[in-house]
C-alpha cells in the first residue's frame, strides 16, 4: 500500500485483541515444541515473540531484521541483521528446534528469506494472508490479501467514521 492508495479493507487490532491472538498462537505452539529459542522478525515480530517466549518459557530470544517497507511503500528486501551464530548453532545450523515469530505473513517474501536462513525452523505468525499462508507452519487468523492490518503500535486514539456514508 502506498501513501496514495487505500487498502481494500481495514482491520484495526487493539492491544487486548493482539494479546489474546498471541496467547492463542502460543496454545497451538505448545503442542509443537519444545523450542530452544525464539527468533523475532523485526520489528513486527518483537511484540508477539515476547508474549510467545514468556508463555512457552523460552529464555533465548534473537532477532532477524529484514526491511520490506519504507513507510507504507513496499520496497526491495534487505537484511539489516542476521540471526546470531549462537542461535543458529542451537538449531544445528538448519533451525531445528527454533521458532520464528512474526506479526503477519503477507506475500511471503520476508518468510522466504528467513526460511532460506534456517529451513527447519518452525514459522509462526499471528495473522496470515493467502499469498503468505503456505510459508507458515502455525497462525491464528487469516485475512484477505487486500486487507490492511492496523497494529496497535501503529495507531493513536482518533475519531472513527461510520462504515456507511451518512450513518452518523
Swiss-Prot record:
What is the E.C. number?
Answer: 2.4.2.-, 2.4.2.22
EC primary class: transferase
Query: Where can this protein be found?
Result: Cell inner membrane
Pathway, according to UniProt?
Purine metabolism; GMP biosynthesis via salvage pathway; GMP from guanine: step 1/1; Purine metabolism; XMP biosynthesis via salvage pathway; XMP from xanthine: step 1/1
Q: How does it sit in the membrane?
A: Peripheral membrane protein
Q: Which GO terms describe its cellular component?
A: plasma membrane
Q: Specify the domain of life of the species encoding this protein.
A: Bacteria
Residue numbers binding 5-phospho-alpha-D-ribose 1-diphosphate: 43-44, 102-110
Q: Which residues bind Mg(2+)?
A: 103
Residues the record lists as binding GMP: 106-110, 148-149
| UniProt cross-references to InterPro entries, sorted A to Z | PRibTrfase_dom (IPR000836), PRTase-like (IPR029057), Xanthine_Guanine_PRibTrfase (IPR023747)
Q: Which reaction does it catalyse?
A: GMP + diphosphate = guanine + 5-phospho-alpha-D-ribose 1-diphosphate; XMP + diphosphate = xanthine + 5-phospho-alpha-D-ribose 1-diphosphate; IMP + diphosphate = hypoxanthine + 5-phospho-alpha-D-ribose 1-diphosphate
Pfam families assigned: Pribosyltran (PF00156)
Q: Name one GO molecular function term.
A: xanthine phosphoribosyltransferase activity
Q: Which UniProt keywords apply?
A: Cell inner membrane, Cell membrane, Glycosyltransferase, Magnesium, Membrane, Metal-binding, Purine salvage, Transferase
Q: Example GO biological process term?
A: GMP salvage
Specify which residues bind xanthine according to the UniProt entry for this protein.
106, 149
Q: Where does guanine bind?
A: 106, 149
What this protein needs as a cofactor is: Mg(2+)
| Family the UniProt entry places it in | Belongs to the purine/pyrimidine phosphoribosyltransferase family. XGPT subfamily.
| Cross-referenced HAMAP family | XGPRT
Give a short account of what the protein does.
Purine salvage pathway enzyme that catalyzes the transfer of the ribosyl-5-phosphate group from 5-phospho-alpha-D-ribose 1-diphosphate (PRPP) to the N9 position of the 6-oxopurines guanine and xanthine to form the corresponding ribonucleotides GMP (guanosine 5'-monophosphate) and XMP (xanthosine 5'-monophosphate), with the release of PPi. To a lesser extent, also acts on hypoxanthine.
Subunit structure and binding partners: Homotetramer.
* Name this polypeptide is given: Xanthine-guanine phosphoribosyltransferase
Q: Which organism is it from?
A: Nitrobacter hamburgensis (strain DSM 10229 / NCIMB 13809 / X14)
Higher taxonomy: Bacteria, Pseudomonadati, Pseudomonadota, Alphaproteobacteria, Hyphomicrobiales
Amino acid at each position: 500500500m502506498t501513501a496514495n492508495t487505500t487498502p481494500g479493507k481495514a482491520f484495526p487490532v487493539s492491544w487486548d485483541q493482539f494479546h489474546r491472538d498471541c496467547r492463542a498462537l502460543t496454545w497451538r505452539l505448545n503442542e509443537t515444541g519444545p523450542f530452544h529459542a525464539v527468533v523475532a522478525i523485526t520489528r513486527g515480530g518483537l511484540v508477539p515473540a515476547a508474549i510467545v517466549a514468556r508463555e512457552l518459557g523460552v529464555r533465548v530470544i534473537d532477532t532477524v531484521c529484514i526491511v520490506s517497507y519504507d513507510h507504507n511503500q513496499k520496497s526491495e528486501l534487505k537484511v539489516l541483521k542476521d540471526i546470531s551464530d549462537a542461535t543458529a548453532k542451537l538449531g544445528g545450523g538448519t533451525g531445528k528446534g527454533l521458532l520464528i515469530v512474526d506479526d503477519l505473513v503477507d506475500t511471503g517474501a520476508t518468510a522466504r528469506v528467513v526460511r532460506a536462513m534456517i529451513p527447519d525452523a518452525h514459522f509462526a505468525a499471528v495473522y496470515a494472508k493467502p499469498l503468505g499462508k503456505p510459508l507458515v507452519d502455525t497462525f491464528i487468523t487469516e485475512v484477505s490479501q487486500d486487507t490492511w492490518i492496523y497494529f496497535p503500535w501503529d495507531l493513536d486514539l482518533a475519531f472513527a467514521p461510520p462504515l456507511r456514508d451518512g450513518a452518523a
